[in-house]
């Protein structure tokens, strides 16, 4: 086996072949790098301007299709990467599978992936040519008001980091943003995190959106304490990542609520102690005499979960009497398309949010991350609980993960065997089969799918 000093790395291959220009601020790649990559998109030597590649593009009101694009010269903080793998997020299935969903501009589909840096703009400082990187769902500039207050998932420079199109489809400008259903990714460095690992790309890709979200809800925003009870609604890729985060943090009981049978089985495999089918607990009625109090319902699922979390004693002077779990994680959301597996009691996802609030104990924590609820849908909360209660609620689509801080930690957990993303990345598709990958995600016949463009 070759020693580390003699082993050829991506960075060594690319930087050896590069020609430094602009005081070393950008790297231009030569043909020898192309030969080393074996099958990468056509590579030029002029700061990538004019380079051609294929991508899955959404334009006008039609369905996305694989198109040939041309790279514009890199500017500012732009980073160009050869894509290794990208995860198909469920939130994109309507854009990909339903004709007539409008878009204001031509865009590369997807948000986040794994790749290797092949060129950088003149102002890039945090990554180099040859780096293996994660392109994250959220930007993290590290300088704005929100980033400085440890809420990089709400970075204020996210939209500004990609101000214009980065490539062209004939005479049509195309915006790349963080789209990774493409042979190349082009985005700003605020979205890019170098990682130093040889783990399979398909597994790392699960961290770019869903995995990082689930782990964030149990490990960062409202971290689970050792020996606590956790209830997780939903066993998709977000929920199953949350299961593993709760296990890593030392939860004693991890209860997963999920209507799909095979996902309940996977939840047990990944660390859940109990699984519950919500379709077996559909009884819900307002408590007699409750009047207009919003949260006075008798819900059979909520009662069952409370019973599972019941302490061994009700003696409050002996530390007992808690009602409900310590932590609740909501990872359900609304159905965008009808699944081909078991359906839950409410396809809008609103009932789950209501049940989470009712289940939460007086001093418990609730983390929510779902999207896709019908416009105008409401969750009812009593005024007294809202104004004078002690429940804690942590919302956010990123689950609280700081991508540039936490991605490397999650990779380390994968390397040590504490975090299993292989089970979640259940099926892999080439770029030409991207629509089929999204269809499988929409059908929910597998936990998650991955596209490997190159």
Task: Spell out what each predicted region is.
Residues 2-51, 315-316, 322-323, 354, ...:
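C-terminal hydrophobic helical "lid"/dimerization subdomain
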Residues 72-87, 98-148, 153, 194-199:
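Glycine-rich beta-strand-centered segment in the early N-terminal region that forms part
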Residues 70-71, 104-110, 173-177, 184:
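Short Gly/Pro-enriched turn/cap motifs at secondary-structure boundaries
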Residues 222-226, 249, 270-391:
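Glycine-rich cofactor phosphate-binding loops and adjacent beta1-alpha1 units
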Residues 54, 112-114, 132, 146, ...:
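Residue-level marker of beta-strand positions
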Residues 196-292:
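Mid-domain Rossmann-like dinucleotide-binding core that forms the NAD(H)/NADP(H) cofactor-binding site
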Residues 143-233:
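NAD(P)H dinucleotide-binding glycine-rich loop of Rossmann-like/cofactor-binding domains
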Residues 28-68, 77, 82, 292:
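C-terminal segment of N-terminal export signals and the immediately downstream linker at the start
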């Amino acid at each position: 086996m070759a020693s580390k000093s003699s082993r050829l790395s991506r960075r060594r291959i690319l930087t050896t072949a590069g020609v430094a220009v602009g005081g070393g601020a950008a790297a231009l790649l030569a043909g020898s790098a192309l030969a080393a990559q074996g099958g990468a998109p056509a590579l030029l030597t002029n700061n990538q301007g004019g380079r051609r590649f294929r991508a899955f593009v959404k334009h006008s009101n039609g369905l996305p299709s694989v198109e040939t694009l041309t790279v514009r010269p890199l500017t500012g903080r732009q980073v160009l990467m050869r894509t290794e793998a990208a995860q198909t997020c469920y939130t994109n299935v309507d854009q990909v599978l339903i004709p007539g969903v409008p878009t204001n501009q031509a865009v590369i589909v997807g948000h986040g992936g794994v790749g290797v840096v092949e060129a950088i703009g003149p102002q890039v400082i945090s990554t180099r040519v040859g780096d293996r990187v994660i392109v994250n769902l959220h930007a993290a500039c590290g300088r704005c008001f929100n980033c400085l207050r440890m809420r990089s998932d709400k970075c204020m420079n996210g939209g500004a980091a990609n101000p214009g199109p980065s490539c062209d489809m004939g005479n049509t400008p195309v915006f790349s943003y963080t789209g990774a259903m493409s042979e190349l990714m082009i985005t700003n460095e605020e979205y890019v995190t170098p990682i130093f690992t040889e783990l399979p790309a398909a597994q790392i890709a699960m961290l770019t959106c869903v995995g990082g979200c689930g782990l964030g809800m149990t490990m960062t925003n409202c971290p689970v304490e050792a020996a606590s009870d956790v209830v997780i609604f939903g066993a998709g890729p977000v929920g199953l990542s949350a299961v593993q985060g709760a296990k890593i943090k030392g939860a004693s009981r991890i209860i997963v609520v999920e209507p799909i049978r095979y996902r309940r089985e996977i939840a047990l495999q990944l660390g859940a102690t109990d699984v519950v089918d919500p379709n077996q607990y559909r009884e819900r009625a307002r408590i007699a005499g409750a009047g207009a109090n919003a949260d006075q319902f008798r819900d059979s699922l909520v009662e069952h979960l409370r019973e599972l979390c019941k302490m061994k004693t009700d003696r409050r002077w002996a530390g007992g009497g808690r009602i409900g779990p310590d932590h609740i994680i909501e990872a359900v959301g609304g159905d965008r398309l009808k699944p081909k597996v078991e359906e839950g009691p409410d396809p809008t996802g609103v009932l789950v949010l209501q049940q989470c609030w009712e289940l939460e104990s007086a001093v418990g924590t609730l983390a929510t991350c779902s999207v896709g609820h019908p416009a105008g849908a409401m969750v009812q909360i009593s005024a007294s609980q809202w104004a004078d209660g002690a429940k804690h609620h942590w919302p956010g689509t990123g689950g609280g993960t700081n991508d540039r801080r936490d991605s490397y930690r999650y990779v380390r957990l994968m390397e040590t065997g504490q975090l299993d993303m292989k089970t979640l990345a259940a099926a892999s598709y080439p770029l030409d089969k991207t629509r089929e990958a999204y269809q499988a995600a929409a059908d929910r016949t597998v936990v998650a799918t991955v596209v490997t463009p190159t």
